Amino acid sequence: MNANPTFLAATAEVDAAAVAPLPKSRKVYETGSRPDIRVPFREIEQADTPTMFGGEKNPPLTVYDTSGPYTDPQASIDIRRGLPALRRAWIEERGDTEVLDGPTSDYGKERLTDPKLTAMRFDLQRPPRRARAGANVTQMHYARRGIVTPEMEFIALRENLRREHYLETLRASGPDGEKLAKRLLRQHPGQSFGAALPSAITPEFVREEVARGRAIIPANINHPEIEPMIIGRNFLVKINANIGNSAVSSGIGEEVEKMTWAIRWGGDTVMDLSTGKHIHETREWIIRNSPVPIGTVPIYQALEKVDGKAEELTWEIFRDTLIEQAEQGVDYFTIHAGVRLPFIPMTADRMTGIVSRGGSIMAKWCLAHHKESFLYERFEEICEIMKAYDVSFSLGDGLRPGSGYDANDEAQFAELKTLGELTQVAWKHDVQVMIEGPGHVPMQMIKENMELQLKHCDEAPFYTLGPLTTDIAPGYDHITSGIGAALIGWYGTAMLCYVTPKEHLGLPNKKDVKDGIITYKIAAHAADLAKGHPGAAIRDNALSKARFEFRWDDQFNLGLDPDTAKEFHDETLPKDSMKVAHFCSMCGPHFCSMKITQDVRDYAAAQGVSEKDALQQGMQEKAVEFVKKGAEVYHRT
């Protein structure tokens, strides 16, 4: 697809690379209590264990799937029409919303009637909705009234990953099925740092966590296309992928491609951080084609409306922007309401000052007017807008540290306390909240961030950017931050915002997006393992079994990135025959540790002794052989 002005709605096409199923994978669905609750998963086919290793069946493995209909061969994908409105019936039957005649924001009306935008505009036939007068349509409001919504049931099924089904298929796989099931479901005890991880997620548990404020379901009533998901420390750790154009790079087509690419590899949510041309139109195309929640930073677009002059921002412009984006279907807003006038001087001695774009915008406004932030002063009015559309807060950390030097300083924690106070205000309105966190933090200082967030914000979900654990690796900050992300995820962070290799350097392309996502999927999964999340080790165990049995294709396919794993293997062992070889190019055929281990097991079986006895017996035989050959360390050839 081409960029900015040349993007044409009539010829828009889905990215072919995003729609093909992953190798040996198929889309499967689990139906809930009603036929329109169909929860998607990816099922990975496995080969049978080779006869020499026991010849047992290896049933398909179910994994979490964020790719939506794009990887379902039965789905008809046309990005000009958008995705099906999965939640429409659920929203309508609640009877607490009204259909509007059209956009009610001034800017939304302006864009809709601008003839110059016709060729690039998404042709949405469905008008927006909002809450009826006096109604509250948030998932938190329903949860606090004791209502288990279809979204909550959908999430419960999704979080359980069909573990019971997998257990049953293992048990039915053969005469040793029970033994195999016990082996593959084995998991080391975790350290959850106070998180309450039930053995199975129920719809009622989802409701309780949302009612308590410990979890959020980002699900704007104007984004019926999403497949519901949850963010909370008692659930699987999630990751977010940032996309978005700039004034000098990328356009609508590229950003839609990045979104479909991001969800293919595991992005649980996507933030559109566009700051260039056609922000409104870009966002519409992304939302209409996204099965995952979309977040934004509304102050970015508000700033564009005043030609980049922060001091000219007004509450009226910002309010109109909130309504504009809420009526498009944005699921969560990053709002930097904790950047207060008294906190700005606290950043004076920092090495890197205020590095958050949103934070710096509001700091400049506060200083220009020498007034308290209108985001802080008008926070209750913002809550009224949020609950009319069920937009969740992502309370921004505008004073986050931009270097390890500035980590855990007075400004950062003053803002965090304020975010905790604002959380209580939002909860008074039954508006869902998560809290954004740093940033750049050395490893030994990360745990304090989590502990203080839990204390000040009353266990509202934490959503962190990394944190980056060192500042010496431009070009590799997906790694410096992945280390911190794994740690803070273990300590209790609910969602990790990915960092790409281009962080601090430039706008990420599709490859950067994938690299960032895979890095953060690793971090999130490592955190789930460390917390002891039920069933977290199943995929690890299945892949380890495949590795030991030299099922190369299964190793590739069970991994997070089958394409890259296969590519690396094929660089040195490209032939199909090498896919059944009992070695890889690292050690070769004579030094493969797993092959040697298997040889020991075969020897033990042949001798009718234990592996331990086989090792001892084998060493004795080799000792005798050594003496018979003259007891020489080296022999002439």
Curated annotation (Swiss-Prot):
Its EC number is 4.1.99.17. It holds the Pfam family ThiC-associated. Binds 1 [4Fe-4S] cluster per subunit. The cluster is coordinated with 3 cysteines and an exchangeable S-adenosyl-L-methionine. GO terms for molecular function: 4 iron, 4 sulfur cluster binding; carbon-carbon lyase activity; zinc ion binding. PANTHER family: PHOSPHOMETHYLPYRIMIDINE SYNTHASE, CHLOROPLASTIC, THIAMINE BIOSYNTHESIS PROTEIN THIC. It is an enzyme of class 4 (lyase). InterPro entries: ThiC, ThiC-associated_dom, ThiC/Bza_core_dom, ThiC/BzaA/B. It comes from Bordetella pertussis (strain Tohama I / ATCC BAA-589 / NCTC 13251). Belongs to the ThiC family. Gene3D superfamilies: 6.10.250.620, Radical SAM ThiC family, central domain. Homodimer. Catalyzes the synthesis of the hydroxymethylpyrimidine phosphate (HMP-P) moiety of thiamine from aminoimidazole ribotide (AIR) in a radical S-adenosyl-L-methionine (SAM)-dependent reaction. Substrate binds at N242, M271, Y300, H336, S356, R357, G358, D397, G398, L399, R400, E436, Y463. This is Phosphomethylpyrimidine synthase.
